Amino acid sequence: MKKEPVHILPLYLPCLLMFLLSSLRQITGDARARAVKVTCSPLLEHNETAYVPNFVATMEKISTQVQTSGFGVALTGTGPDANYGLAQCYGDLPLNDCVLCYAEARTMLPQCYPQNGGRIFLDGCFMRAENYSFYNEYKGPEDSIVCGNTTRKNKTFGDAVRQGLRNAVTEASGTGGYARASAKAGESESESAFVLANCWRTLSPDSCKQCLENASASVVKGCLPWSEGRALHTGCFLRYSDQDFLNKIPRNGRSRGSVVVIVVSVLSSVVVFMIGVAVSVYICKRRTIKRKRRGSKDVEKMAKTLKDSSLNFKYSTLEKATGSFDNANKLGQGGFGTVYKGVLPDGRDIAVKRLFFNNRHRATDFYNEVNMISTVEHKNLVRLLGCSCSGPESLLVYEYLQNKSLDRFIFDVNRGKTLDWQRRYTIIVGTAEGLVYLHEQSSVKIIHRDIKASNILLDSKLQAKIADFGLARSFQDDKSHISTAIAGTLGYMAPEYLAHGQLTEMVDVYSFGVLVLEIVTGKQNTKSKMSDYSDSLITEAWKHFQSGELEKIYDPNLDWKSQYDSHIIKKEIARVVQIGLLCTQEIPSLRPPMSKLLHMLKNKEEVLPLPSNPPFMDERVMELRDGSDGDSAGCASLATVSQSSFYGR
């Protein structure tokens, strides 16, 4: 077949020129990425498996649009699994600041899970996601106001606010849904009122006008005489203040001749630069083609190697061992397969994971799991005995652990009594030791990506063993971001990974921190806030840590007060909670590595650093003053626990 020539310059030159020229027009403003309020849908998401990929895909589609227009809508999925999204920056926000505001909103909105939708108002932008088309809605029961409480103003200021609101609402209703206005309070410039009014671009002019009029009436009635007020309505955002919060209207500060000189300089540089780009792209393209071909051969080669190795089990042997995969022997169900108990001809108990896949990606996952687990061996990792890749489906064979998974104990009122504090502490330390091995001591560094209670198995002595390497990925020291799909379990996933796909060992550290808090409290991260929109477990632990009342969240099954050394145990538990909070800090670089955490756990007298705020601290209502909004809707957190099996996926 004749190879088509690669025309690089015509393809990349216009794109690069547009980027460089647009960069000349960028201005520096205030991204106003401070969250004002988050409101979540009252209904639960019915399909956990579909939610994450649909939400992430919707956000990616919107991201592309926001970068060019400051606005985006997208739909992913169908029926009850559909994810409708909308994001819009307010009209005075420069595009580069808009992108920053959107990135912040995208990071925070997932806290609504497992509710099936939610909306977030920031001071610079708005975002909403639901499982139905809401684009034409302009009012609803969630409409509310948020008022500042710094200063009470006089009647003259109130008159200026009313005038500014009238001007902004009138202008926005007739000019595409956005307006800014200011009005003097008497003769004093320092007492002026500044107003911003913005409708979502999906609304009709009539709906926009109605929304802004309702918003104006509510903020005047509810916020004056306070110096600041915001109306957070279904179809619009309105704000007034005695401070000029608006970004300046950009002015052309250069002469036309200066701009020409800059453009000519840029164009002359581009000619030279594009030669390098053309060569680089050509080389990268050739390498990619070779890598794809090599990857296909690698899968086939690995399959043959496994079939000929000592790890290989006959399919018929495993089928017989599990009673033809009888449901009576079923141990659990996960996203990638079902796990069964089996008995080999020599009497050994085994756990068999039955995988179904019909594409190369799933096949690669299978060989990746076998290849990775077979190279690691540690007392706190589940041992892989072998596999079968010759039958109608692929099978993994693990050692069988009769106590199954940790979640069966800590989240059960009766079984939880089996695990006193010392046993739970040992499980925490054992899990940490397993992660230290994966991150720092194995021949290939491994990020597990799905550390959670159902993936911590317990042997006959209740020692912890980490299971489920199906999601594990090896990584290089210079690689902190991956392009593969995000995988894991909501509630254990670090915010930077869920929002941006940023994968480092700190993703496991975050998950470990959530697990530690669950072990201490006996609460699931989701279940802790399922009623009345109460706080997530992380936020609950943080607040009690701040108030010095941690013992209020301890699992009653710990029964620490009845022990003769209860004061020592109380101190140990509080220390472990503090370690859990260090793991779940919002900024990844502040989280200690697993080796440091293990050192902290074992050296009980060492002084610990104070943790900073966890993600989504003000997750119920992020507002300026308590009790100021009319309909204070609660908000669930990011956290949830999946239905994964206790032998992993």
Curated annotation (Swiss-Prot):
GO biological process, one term: response to ozone
Catalysed reaction, written as an equation: L-seryl-[protein] + ATP = O-phospho-L-seryl-[protein] + ADP + H(+); L-threonyl-[protein] + ATP = O-phospho-L-threonyl-[protein] + ADP + H(+)
Post-translational modification Phosphotyrosine, affected residues: 398, 497
Keywords, ordered alphabetically: ATP-binding, Glycoprotein, Kinase, Membrane, Nucleotide-binding, Phosphoprotein, Receptor, Repeat, Serine/threonine-protein kinase, Signal, Transferase, Transmembrane, Transmembrane helix
Cytoplasmic compartment segments: 280-649
Gene3D superfamilies according to UniProt: Gnk2 domain, C-X8-C-X2-C motif, Phosphorylase Kinase, domain 1, Transferase(Phosphotransferase) domain 1
Pfam family for this entry, one: Pkinase
Key word Ligase present: no
Topology in the lipid bilayer: Single-pass membrane protein
A single Gene Ontology CC term: plasmodesma
Record: residues binding ATP: 331-339, 353
Top-level lineage group: Eukaryota
Phosphoserine: modified positions: 454, 483
Protein name per its UniProtKB record: Cysteine-rich receptor-like protein kinase 2
Organism in which the protein naturally occurs: Arabidopsis thaliana
Taxonomic lineage of the native organism: Eukaryota, Viridiplantae, Streptophyta, Embryophyta, Tracheophyta
